[in-house]
Amino acid sequence: TGDFMQIIGIVTEYNPFHNGHLYQIKKIKEMYPDSVIIVAMSGNYTMRGEISVLDKWNKTNIAINNGIDIVLEIPFIYSNQSSDIFSYAALKMLNEFKIEKLVFGSETNNIDLLSLASSVQIDNKKFDSLVKDYMSKGYNYPSSIGKSIYELTGIKIKESNDILGVSYIKEILKNKYNIKPISIKRTNNFKTNTKKSNIISAYEIREFLNKNESIKEYVPNNV
């Protein structure tokens, strides 16, 4: 791809596509003006097993109309699983398309911290046994992972985008993919319950849709 054109990957659900997603795409184009942006996206069902607000064809059209070049569908058997399995499939696909950088939103926006929280999980018997200990005490799997990371590194990974970011970086490290992770500061949390900004989370937009409230100020005009 030479020095000029960069192939950038994004992992997403676009459920639905909103101003925060558009902000991310604009930031990528600012940082890498001649980039090709490839998205790995869940289809008609999301990671939580819910039916997507829009079907995959509409989501794809909206993505293309807002600056994405290629949309890949994460197969259903991976896309409605845990963040680790979701990330495994997404990164495998994006690596096959030779992306050089993976860009994702992050609450902490600290790649070094997220990388440390990722690397401590790889081929680490101490980590594995800590996770088992926490699960035997009644914690669920994600909480056990978070507590084990904290015990070994002092890093607290609590926010949804950071959790996904750690999953992505872990896949990159584990598989020795030649992909550089790049974080963009998240302007809002997963559930902020505020209408002060025109960028709110997909979760909040789905809540507004459930209440038949208008979402037009939170999504691009072509959504």
Task: Please give the residue ranges for each predicted region.
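Short beta-strands and strand-loop turn motifs
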Residues: G9-V11, A40-M41, L72-I74, I182-I184
